[in-house]
């Protein structure tokens, strides 16, 4: 547990603040109440009645109970006097009052002596308060219930509490009660007890002085008695003048319990020892002098005697004797007492007024103190809450840091484990490389031994080969059987062809039958067409549908034709396959015939094969070397590309700087434009102002002229008035003058306002001009900077051009390298083709060797095998030397690459330094020279790279030549092999082939290829490990850079926040201190605009001036004391503030450390998370790619299945289409015939239509005639009616004629409508046909 986490720290801060506040107000209240105590001492001279003995007994009983319950806490001890006062105030009304004698008023000299003594004791008390904080809490809390006396807490009790820490709580309770009794003691006791307290301090501090005699104890008892009687309590209330009897009763009620407490305390042994120690050195003479000065009444004397009787029985006789002789003296004392009472009453009246004022001041000060206490409590509460919150945050942050540390340790352990694992892998790889070299040597030796053993075996296996040759003859027989089977298959294929032809014949027959059926149907349909001639309009619609159907049928026919063509192509393919099978059968026959002759040139073929194998292996080695060389070149290209990327990034940075400069220049242009705009605005304003001023000046001149003219007119009018004194004219003139005066005043006011506006506008113009001048200066500065930047930009552009040229060169080099890589890939393809050809040749040679039946001699073959073994050994040696040379080359290339990387890193650092220097200082000649040197170095490097590339090109050209030579040799070998084949066909051999030797050779070759593959895999693993290491280094550098940048950012943020918080905290403390001082000293006024130090100095000077003005008054001293205390409080507060600041600084440092550690770990975790995300993304991409491939394969399978189904479906549809085709052909023919018939019918109908049109014309003419006749008949009827000659027969005939004519007209109209409808239908039909 640290200091800030302990409970002691939580409790200590608020307790210290509370004690300081209470001490301050306690001391302040004590000093302000000193004058009130002097006034109250004068009131104590009044007669105070005492209580009866019964009441004393009851009080003693109550006191015993209180002593038993005295072991209370500090809060209980505070509540005791309040309850006590309330009970006494309620009990006063029912009790009988007995007068008690009062002390005589002290003289002014005694008051001065008392003040001096109190001033001496004040520093002693303050030292006690600062040393004993626990003891000082008790009196600070007991001051609150407004005590009258100014007596401080006795130091003897504090010393006793220090000496006796093991006492019980009852002792503490009794000590608290003693303190309450002493607060109510009279000022006479104060004067006597002050020196006693000093002496008791010395006794308690040293522990040397002790009580020795019983006489001193008796004297101490005598001292306590009058002091108890003298103690009084006078409350500070406004109603003191109205009822003094109640005041006296309250005083008595408060005195009596104190007296009883004093009597009971003297009875206790422990309390007696303390009082003996306090009053040990009091002189008896001083006690007698104090008694002589005091005047007692009879009742008071009796009370004193009763108390003395209770104390000691020996003194009673002496008191009785002295009382008899002093009766006369008492009479004189009574007379003097009456006089004193009169004086005291006057003083009391004065003091009551003073008390009222003091009470008012006390109330105001109490209110202020309560407000201050409330604020301080609120402040303490807020501080405690903030402290708790801060502590919780600290705990949380501490836990988080612990968790992060645990995580960091885990990560570190993981990294260490990974590093150890990588080291193990590197060791394993090194061991594997060493093991492979050892294994190669051991394998080579083992292979030699195996070859020797195989040589011995070959002799034994020759006998077995003869048996194998017999088996081969059996295989030949089996091949002949296979040929017979193929012939059978051909016969079956011919049968199938015949079946297909029969199927086609059947289909043609069916097609012809279908055609005949269609013809019969066509005849039936012709009959139906003749019967359905009236329904031609309906058939036209069906014809449209049929035409669409015909189009579909045509398309289906085309598809069917294409399918038939595909079937024909398949049939042709089958025929071609049959022909190929026949050709193969013929070849087999020729091979069987030629197998009898081929064994003379076997030895020569073996030699040629051995030489070819050597050459092939050499070419393979050279190709492997070229492949390694190309891999190294690819790595170098990658490094160069990385360099290019870095240079491009630097160029981008420089471009960003140039863009920023361009943006700054653009902003400058904008500023210049805005300045020009403002200048134009200013000019416009100036012109407007000048125009307004000129207008106003002209108006002013006009008004002056008018004023002069008016004055002249006034003078003329005055002359006229003097000549002709008419009152009306005079009044009119006066009115005119007044109106013109008012106009002049308004004009003057307008001029004044115009002048004021002109002045304001001139001020605005001046301000705008100043702003314009400042802006022009800024523009000039910016232009100067821009010029500097332009020079820098020109340099940057030159550098960019150089870099661009270098990039072009690098790109050209990359393109050349890519072209070379493509050439190499093509050459590899050619080499693979050559290998395949060589393998084919080997297979042919093997077949030839198998086909050999005879060999010349076994000894020649053995010699050839030995030669082959020697050649293999030579090849292995050459391979070893080549591998060693390649390893050396790789090591040198690796060193060269490392040197290039170091140079690149140095160049990067140099470029960064140059960029920083360019930002700090605009173009410097030294840096330019350095850049030029760097460029020269890069050019030299480019030249080196070009030379290297040229060397590589030369190597490639030489290798290309070698490959061409090898190809030419292969061609020669092919020609020789063909010649050998021909010779073998001509000559037959009877010797068996050596298959086992060929198998051994092939096994050796396979082993060599496997070793080469292992070497390649090991090289790839080493390169992969190097790449991983380089990637890890780059990631570490990037992480370090990110951490440094984040640390800088966080430090800046923390410093800014800490500065702002400190300033706010200091300002808050200063404001609080100012408010406290203003509340304490409201009369002092200091301007608030000053700084805190100047304000404090001014605040110190103002009270001093007030003190100089009121130097004679006692209030000045009190204020000085208050100022001292305030200064002390201020120092204490400053110390606390400094402590808080130190604590805050420590906490801020801890927080910064925590933040740094947290951010570091966060960055590390972020890096790890990014890596994991990248890996996850890669896995996801691979997974998605695999899923896509799976889906693609599924789709392909589905497509294949669909295609199969479609194929089957199409075959079915073909059959259906063929059937439908036959039907459709017949239908088409029928439709053609129908079309021809319809056309003929249409022609006949057109002729008929023309005839009908002629008939219609005639009918219309006839209708016109009929209508004219009708009209004439109607005219005749009208004539007959007029003539009244109309027989009934003629009328009936005319009616019938009219009816018949109407019927004929309606019929003709219906016919016309029908003809029109037919015409419209035929027109539509023609449109459809067209």
From Swiss-Prot:
InterPro entries in the cross-refs: Kinectin, Rib_rcpt_KP
Role played: Receptor for kinesin thus involved in kinesin-driven vesicle motility.
Coiled coil: 332-1329
Tissues with expression: Expressed in male brain, heart, kidney, liver, lung, spleen and testis.
Complex formation: Parallel homodimers formed between the membrane-bound and the cytosolic form, and also between 2 cytosolic forms.
Cystine pairs: none
Name of the featured protein: Kinectin
Modified residues (Phosphoserine): 75, 77, 156, 1085, 1286
Residues bearing PTM Phosphothreonine: 153
Main location group: endoplasmic reticulum
Subcellular localization, as worded in the UniProt entry: Endoplasmic reticulum membrane
Signal peptide: none
Species per Swiss-Prot/TrEMBL record: Vulpes vulpes (Red fox)
Biased composition (Basic and acidic residues): 123-135, 172-182
GO cellular component: endoplasmic reticulum membrane
Lumenal compartment segments: 30-1330
Any one GO MF annotation of this record: kinesin binding
Spans annotated as Disordered: 49-81, 108-218
Residues of this chain annotated as glycosylated in UniProt: 172, 435, 772, 904, 1055, 1236, 1302
Gene label: KTN1
A Gene Ontology BP annotation from the UniProt entry: protein transport
Residues spanning the membrane: 7-29
Biased composition (Basic residues): 113-122, 161-171
Topological domain ranges for the Cytoplasmic compartment: 1-6
UniProt superkingdom: Eukaryota
Keywords, comma-separated and alphabetical: Coiled coil, Endoplasmic reticulum, Glycoprotein, Membrane, Phosphoprotein, Signal-anchor, Transmembrane, Transmembrane helix
Family according to the record: Belongs to the kinectin family.
């Amino acid at each position: 547990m640290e200091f800030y986490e302990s409970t002691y720290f939580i409790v200590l801060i608020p307790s210290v603040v509370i004690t300081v506040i209470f001490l301050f107000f306690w001391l302040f209240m004590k000093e302000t109440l000193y004058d009130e105590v002097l006034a109250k001492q004068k009131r104590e001279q009044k007669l105070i009645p005492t209580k009866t003995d019964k009441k004393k007994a009851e009080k003693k009983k109550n006191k015993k109970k209180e002593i038993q319950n005295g072991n209370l806490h500090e809060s209980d001890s505070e509540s005791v006097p309040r309850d006590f006062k309330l009970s006494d105030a309620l009990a006063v009304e029912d009790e009988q009052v007995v007068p008690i004698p009062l002390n005589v008023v002290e003289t002014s000299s005694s008051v001065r002596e008392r003040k001096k003594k109190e001033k001496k004791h004040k520093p002693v008390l303050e030292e006690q308060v600062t040393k004993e904080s626990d003891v000082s809490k008790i009196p600070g809390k007991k001051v609150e219930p407004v005590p009258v006396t100014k007596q401080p807490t006795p130091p003897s009790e504090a010393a006793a509490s220090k000496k006796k820490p093991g006492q019980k709580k009852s002792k503490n309770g009794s000590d608290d009660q003693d303190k309450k009794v002493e607060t109510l003691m009279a000022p006479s006791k104060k004067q006597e007890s002050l020196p006693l307290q000093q002496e008791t301090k010395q006794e308690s501090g040293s522990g040397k002085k002790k009580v020795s005699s019983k006489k001193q104890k008796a004297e101490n008892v005598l001292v306590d008695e009058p002091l108890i009687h003298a103690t009084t309590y006078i409350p500070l209330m406004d109603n003191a003048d109205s009822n003094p009897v109640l005041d006296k009763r309250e005083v008595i009620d408060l005195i009596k319990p104190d007296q009883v407490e004093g009597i009971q305390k003297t009875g206790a042994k422990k309390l007696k020892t303390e009082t003996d120690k306090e009053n040990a050195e009091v002189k008896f003479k001083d006690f007698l002098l104090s008694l002589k000065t005091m005047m007692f009444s009879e009742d008071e004397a009796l009370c004193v005697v009763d108390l003395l009787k209770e104390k000691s029985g020996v003194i009673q006789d002496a008191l009785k004797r002295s009382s008899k002789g002093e009766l006369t003296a008492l009479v004189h004392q009574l007379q003097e007492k009456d006089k004193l009472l009169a004086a005291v009453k006057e003083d009391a009246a004065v003091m009551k007024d003073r008390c009222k004022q003091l009470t008012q001041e006390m109330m105001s000060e109490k209110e202020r103190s309560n407000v201050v206490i409330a604020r301080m409590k609120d402040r303490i509460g807020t501080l405690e809450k903030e402290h708790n919150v801060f502590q919780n945050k600290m705990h949380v942050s501490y836990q988080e840091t612990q968790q992060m540390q645990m995580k960091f340790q885990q990560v570190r352990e993981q990294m260490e484990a990974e590093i150890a694992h990588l080291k193990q892998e590197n060791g394993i790889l090194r061991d594997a490389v060493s093991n492979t070299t050892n294994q190669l040597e051991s394998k080579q030796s083992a292979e030699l031994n195996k070859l020797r053993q195989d040589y011995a075996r070959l002799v034994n296996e020759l006998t077995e080969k003869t048996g194998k040759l017999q088996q081969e003859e059996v295989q030949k027989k089996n091949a002949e059987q296979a040929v017979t089977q193929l012939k059978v298959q051909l016969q079956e294929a011919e049968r199938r062809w015949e079946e297909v032809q029969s199927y086609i014949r059947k289909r043609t027959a069916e097609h012809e039958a279908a055609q005949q059926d269609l013809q019969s149907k066509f005849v039936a349909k012709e009959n139906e067409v003749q019967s359905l001639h009236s329904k031609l309009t309906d058939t036209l619609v069906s014809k449209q549908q049929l035409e669409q159907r015909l189009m579909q049928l045509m398309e289906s026919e085309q598809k069917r034709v294409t399918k038939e063509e595909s079937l024909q192509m398949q049939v042709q393919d089958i025929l071609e396959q049959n022909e190929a099978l026949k050709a193969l059968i013929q070849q087999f026959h020729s091979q069987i015939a030629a197998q009898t002759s081929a064994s003379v040139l076997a030895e020569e073929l073996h030699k040629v094969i051995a030489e070819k194998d050597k050459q092939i292996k050499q070419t393979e080695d050279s190709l492997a070397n070229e492949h390694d060389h190309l891999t190294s070149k690819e790595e170098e290209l990658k490094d160069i590309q990385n360099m290019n990327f870095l240079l491009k990034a630097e160029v981008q940075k420089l471009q960003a700087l140039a863009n920023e400069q361009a943006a700054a220049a653009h902003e400058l242009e904008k500023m210049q434009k805005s300045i020009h705009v403002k200048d134009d605005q200013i000019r416009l304003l100036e012109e407007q102002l000048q125009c307004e001023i000129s207008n106003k000046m002209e108006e002013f001149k006009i008004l002056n002229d008018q004023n002069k003219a008016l004055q002249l007119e006034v003078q003329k009018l005055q002359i006229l008035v003097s000549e002709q004194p008419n009152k009306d004219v005079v009044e009119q003139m006066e009115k005119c003058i007044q109106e013109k005066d008012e106009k002049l005043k308004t004009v003057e006011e307008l001029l004044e306002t115009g002048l004021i506006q002109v002045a304001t506008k001139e001020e605005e113009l001046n301000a705008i001009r100043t702003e314009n001048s400042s802006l022009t200066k800024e523009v000039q500065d910016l232009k100067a900077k821009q010029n500097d930047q332009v020079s820098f930009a020109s340099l940057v552009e030159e550098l960019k051009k150089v870099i661009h040229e270098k990039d072009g060169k690098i790109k050209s080099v990359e393109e050349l390298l890519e072209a070379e890589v493509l050439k190499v890939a093509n050459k590899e393809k050619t080499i693979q083709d050559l290998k395949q050809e060589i393998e084919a040749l080997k297979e042919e040679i093997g077949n030839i060797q198998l086909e050999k039946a005879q060999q010349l001699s076994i000894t020649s073959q053995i010699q050839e095998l030995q030669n082959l073994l020697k050649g293999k050994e030579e090849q292995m040696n050459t391979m070893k030397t080549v591998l060693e040379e390649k390893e050396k080359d790789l090591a040198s290339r690796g060193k060269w690459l490392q040197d290039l990387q170091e140079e690149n890193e140095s160049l990067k650092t140099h470029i960064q330094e140059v960029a920083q220097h360019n930002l700090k200082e605009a173009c410097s000649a030294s840096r330019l020279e350095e850049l030029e040197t760097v460029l020269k170095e890069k050019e030299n490097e480019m030249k080196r790279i070009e030379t290297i590339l040229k060397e590589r090109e030369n190597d490639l050209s030489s290798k290309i030549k070698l490959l061409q030579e090898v190809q030419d040799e292969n061609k020669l070998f092919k020609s020789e092999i063909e010649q050998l084949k021909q010779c073998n066909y001509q000559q037959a051999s009877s010797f068996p082939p050596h298959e086992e030797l060929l198998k051994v050779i092939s096994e050796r070759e396979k082993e060599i290829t496997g070793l080469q593959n292992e070497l390649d895999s090991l090289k790839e693993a080493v390169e992969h490990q190097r790449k991983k290491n380089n990637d890890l280094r780059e990631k570490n550098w990037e992480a370090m850079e990110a951490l440094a940048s984040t640390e800088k950012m966080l430090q800046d943020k923390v410093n800014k926040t800490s500065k702002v918080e400190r300033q706010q905290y200091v300002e808050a403390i200063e404001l609080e201190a100012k408010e406290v001082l203003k509340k304490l000293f409201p009369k002092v006024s200091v301007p608030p605009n000053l700084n805190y130090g100047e304000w404090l100095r001014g605040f110190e000077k103002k009270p001093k001036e007030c003190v100089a003005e009121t130097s004679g008054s006692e209030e000045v001293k009190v204020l000085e004391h208050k100022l001292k205390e305030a200064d002390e409080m201020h120092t204490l507060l400053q110390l606390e503030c400094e402590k808080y600041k130190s604590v805050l600084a420590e906490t801020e440092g801890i927080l910064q450390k925590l933040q740094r550690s947290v951010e570091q770990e966060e960055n590390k975790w972020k890096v790890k998370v990014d890596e994991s995300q990248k890996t996850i993304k890669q896995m996801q991409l691979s997974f998605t790619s695999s899923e896509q491939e799976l889906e693609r394969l599924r789709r392909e399978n589905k497509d294949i299945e669909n295609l199969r189904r479609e194929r089957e479906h199409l075959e079915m549809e073909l059959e259906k289409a063929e059937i439908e085709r036959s039907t459709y052909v017949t239908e088409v023919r029928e439709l053609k015939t129908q079309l021809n018939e319809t056309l003929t019918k249409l022609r006949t109908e057109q002729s008929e239509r023309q005839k009908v049109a002629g008939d219609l014309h005639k009918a219309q003419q006839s209708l016109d005639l009929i209508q004219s006749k009708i009209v004439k008949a109607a005219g005749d009827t009208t004539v007959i009616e007029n003539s009244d000659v109309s027989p009934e027969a003629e009328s009936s005939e005319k009616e019938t004629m009219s009816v018949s004519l109407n019927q004929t007209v309606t019929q003709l109209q219906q016919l016309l409508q029908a003809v029109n409808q037919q015409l419209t239908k035929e027109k539509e039909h023609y449109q459809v046909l067209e």
